[in-house]
Amino acid sequence: MTDTPPMVTPMPKPAEVRVLLFSASLRTDSLNTRLARLARSVLETARATVDWATMSEFDGPSYNQDLETGSGFPPGPRELHRRLEACDAFVIATPEYNASMPGHLKNAIDWVSRIRPQPFNARHGLLLSASPSMAGGNRGLWSLRMPLEHLGARVFPDMFSLAQAHKAFGENGGLADSLLAKRFEENLGAFLDLVEAAKHYPCIKKAWVEFLGEPGGEAVGRVEAA
């Protein structure tokens, strides 16, 4: 009798992950732009296709509903909407201004939130910051996280804040501290793993529930019915 090897179901090939990546700083060589460039290198070395953008591409006038009604959506917010719709996930490296996010970033989010389909909903996001301070711009990330999650974005739990960023980069553009560099790479890798899993397994999508004060029983019922 010939032994027949057991049938093995082949594992699905890794899904291509497309990531929109930009720095919310308007300065060409700001600390956050340098951190975003490093993130780009890590993501492309892994398995992601990176759509690199600059904040100036998405800039627009201060949100005004009269302007929206009279002339529609400005080119910058429409471009951000288009690029978000074309990606599986987004990564934003943002400076902290007075314990909050930059006003121009919030303005872009406010504009884009008015365009349908609303592109942040159910889209994965990772938030990064770099600052000369010991807090690394972390308070700015929390202020950014709130409106994104309100709009339904699946913001990755582990945000990355680079403290004393003016001394953190080596000559090659990487992080001089090897342990910190390892943590940064692992953070981005874990984020990609989650986005990739969400593309393969529908059950991952059911795990993301935004309660927003909703009674627990109703939220559970909504997940089970999904």
Predicted segments, located by residue:
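Short beta-strand segments enriched in small/hydrophobic residues
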Residues: 17-25, 125-129, 173
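Mobile beta-alpha loop/short-helix "lid" or hinge segments that flank ligand
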Residues: 51-62, 117, 151-171
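N-terminal beta1-alpha1-beta2 submodule of the flavodoxin-like/Rossmannoid cofactor-binding fold
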Residues: 1-114, 179-189, 200-226
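Glycine-rich NAD(P)-binding loop of Rossmann-like domains
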Residues: 119-122, 170-176
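Short, glycine-/small-residue-rich phosphate/pyrophosphate-handling segment
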Residues: 121-164, 179
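Short glycine/proline-enriched loop/turn "hinge" motifs that connect secondary-structure elements
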Residues: 12-14, 118-120, 154
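Acidic, glycine-rich active-site loops and adjacent beta-strand->loop/helix elements
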Residues: 57-58, 96, 129-132, 166
